[in-house]
Amino acid sequence: MSRLYAIILIALVFNVIMTIMPDMKVEAVSCEDCPEHCATKDQRAKCDNDKCVCEPK
């Protein structure tokens, strides 16, 4: 039973950590959609290795 509580506790802690941590700058957005995606965040669009990167203006 204590293993079940440990698993539930780990899942809850992981969920809280993922909620608190801000999203990483590299998003799963294609380079074609990058300018529109970054414009919604009021940031500058840049493509790195075919991945969209939003940078502060």
UniProtKB/Swiss-Prot annotation:
Domain of life where this protein originates: Eukaryota
Gene Ontology MF term list: ion channel inhibitor activity; potassium channel regulator activity; toxin activity
Task: Give tissue specificity per the record.
Answer: Expressed by the venom gland.
Q: Which UniProt keywords apply?
A: Disulfide bond, Ion channel impairing toxin, Neurotoxin, Potassium channel impairing toxin, Secreted, Signal, Toxin, Voltage-gated potassium channel impairing toxin
- Pro-peptide positions on chain: 20-28
* Compartments, record wording: Secreted
Q: What are the GO cellular component annotations? A: extracellular region
The protein's job, in short, is:
Voltage-gated potassium channel antagonist. Has a high potency on Kv1.3/KCNA3, and is moderately active on Kv1.1/KCNA1 (35% peak current inhibition at 3 uM of toxin) and on Shaker IR potassium channels (70% peak current inhibition at 3 uM of toxin).
Q: What protein family is recorded?
A: Belongs to the short scorpion toxin superfamily. Potassium channel inhibitor family. Alpha-KTx 08 subfamily.
Q: What else is known?
A: Negative results: does not inhibit rKv1.1/KCNA1, rKv1.2/KCNA2, rKv1.4/KCNA4, rKv1.5/KCNA5, rKv1.6/KCNA6, hKv11.1/KCNH2 (when tested at 3 uM).
**Name the UniProt record assigns to this protein:** Potassium channel toxin alpha-KTx 8.6
Source organism of the structure: Mesobuthus eupeus (Lesser Asian scorpion)
Lineage summary: Eukaryota, Metazoa, Ecdysozoa, Arthropoda, Chelicerata
